[in-house]
Amino acid sequence: MERRIFGLETEYGVTCTYRGQRRLSPDEVARYLFRRVVSWGRSSNVFLRNGARLYLDVGSHPEYATPECDSVADLVAHDRAGERILEGLLVDAEKRLHDEGIAGEIYLFKNNTDSAGNSYGCHENYLVSRHGEFGRLADVLIPFLVTRQLICGAGKVLQTPRGAVYCLSQRAEHIWEGVSSATTRSRPIINTRDEPHADAERYRRLHVIVGDSNMNEVTTLLKVGAADIVLRMIESGVVMRDLTLENPIRAIREVSHDITGRRKVRLASGKEISALEIQQEYLAKATEFVERRGGDQTAKRVVELWGRVLSAVETGDLEPVAREIDWVTKLRLIERYQRKHDLPLSHPRVAQMDLAYHDLRRGRGLYGLLERRGQVDRAATDPEIFEAKETPPQTTRARLRGEFIRHAQEKRRDFTVDWVHLKLNDQAQRTVLCKDPFRAYDERVERLIASM
């Protein structure tokens, strides 16, 4: 299969609990968190030696954007590396707070909603050819993305006027459009703002903002891997039945509120079909496509897992995928906790548990606890994640950026970088423009590094 560039941008929730008198606003907490970054990067928006971008987003949300990866497996490791980097900042910030006599603990959550009903996202990026029909791509993808939460939602206890319900997705309640160029005001499923971060004549960046942030590496692998296969099918001209939804925004909420996958949603044709049936159609085509095209090991693992998740949902026996899929893992935890303490789903302690699942601090977060006990499956190893904290992917443009940053820092040279530019801030203001995200070696960059 042809290479594709992938990237994940994850916004994290941040809060602080206090034992003393002094209280900090979210802005102040975020500043403490980024103080170490600002001290060496002179900014709260920096690129790292591993090629990634780390910055404070609107509303004091720390955001980590992975470097460009050309395999889903690499992407999973770099996404987890982002968690470790932020966890390091958290430990540092807490120590500084305590040194200044502020008694409290900082929490970073890899989730998508806070208690005030605000939402922050996990944005997926897929490089696609400029020459395809972008409109058709979006049309075929939307029914897939609306129902994809069935296989990769993060799970959420939602308080409604009719009582608490367990939902598949955290993000579903906050999506208001199908396709749009805005990301915050209207929150579409697919964002169409045209910023390829590459040669604009050849490429376009498909920016999917409907997905949940996942704790489980296997769920992340499935989320991105399944979307990649569906994209490849569309690009290859695979004929798909028209599954256009009458109202994608209503459908995404209806799907989220039904963990059996059986609730019918209405198609534009007037026909009614369940989320499970829609996913089964995409899976059948994907399985045939991967077999015919001779997909790599990751693609084979993705369709196998996709099939197992849909079978588990169809039979109602979720146990076979409880170690791999976030919403199932969390549901099992909550159900056990409810039984043990005889609590209704609406109890505040259940909501607390829901949140604790996403706590990044490994000695404290629930997911981290499951991982340490070997109760969840993995798609990356600890050595791979450790390496991804420092080392960029070696087969994409991220390698050039990472090498440039490393050398400039070691030589104490002033520099500026973004996704496509590498610039030495000397008298000559030498800049190299790297428009090809697949290119990991470039003589111009080597010369720039050698000149330091």
UniProtKB/Swiss-Prot annotation:
Superkingdom per UniProt: Bacteria
Binding site for Mg(2+): 9, 55, 63
GO molecular function, one term: magnesium ion binding
GO biological process: modification-dependent protein catabolic process; proteasomal protein catabolic process; protein pupylation
InterPro entries, per database record: Pup_ligase (IPR022279), Pup_ligase/deamidase (IPR004347)
Residues annotated as binding ATP: 53, 66, 419
EC number: 6.3.1.19
Residue spans crossing the bilayer: none
Reaction catalysis annotation: ATP + [prokaryotic ubiquitin-like protein]-L-glutamate + [protein]-L-lysine = ADP + phosphate + N(6)-([prokaryotic ubiquitin-like protein]-gamma-L-glutamyl)-[protein]-L-lysine
Active site: 57
Pathway per the UniProt entry: Protein degradation; proteasomal Pup-dependent pathway; Protein modification; protein pupylation
Alphabetic keyword roster: ATP-binding, Ligase, Magnesium, Metal-binding, Nucleotide-binding, Ubl conjugation pathway
Pfam family, any one: Pup_ligase
Role: Catalyzes the covalent attachment of the prokaryotic ubiquitin-like protein modifier Pup to the proteasomal substrate proteins, thereby targeting them for proteasomal degradation. This tagging system is termed pupylation. The ligation reaction involves the side-chain carboxylate of the C-terminal glutamate of Pup and the side-chain amino group of a substrate lysine.
Cross-referenced PANTHER family: PUP DEAMIDASE/DEPUPYLASE, PUP--PROTEIN LIGASE
Misc remark: The reaction mechanism probably proceeds via the activation of Pup by phosphorylation of its C-terminal glutamate, which is then subject to nucleophilic attack by the substrate lysine, resulting in an isopeptide bond and the release of phosphate as a good leaving group.
Family that this chain belongs to: Belongs to the Pup ligase/Pup deamidase family. Pup-conjugating enzyme subfamily.
Listed name of the protein: Pup--protein ligase
Organism: Salinispora tropica (strain ATCC BAA-916 / DSM 44818 / JCM 13857 / NBRC 105044 / CNB-440)
Gene expressing this chain: pafA
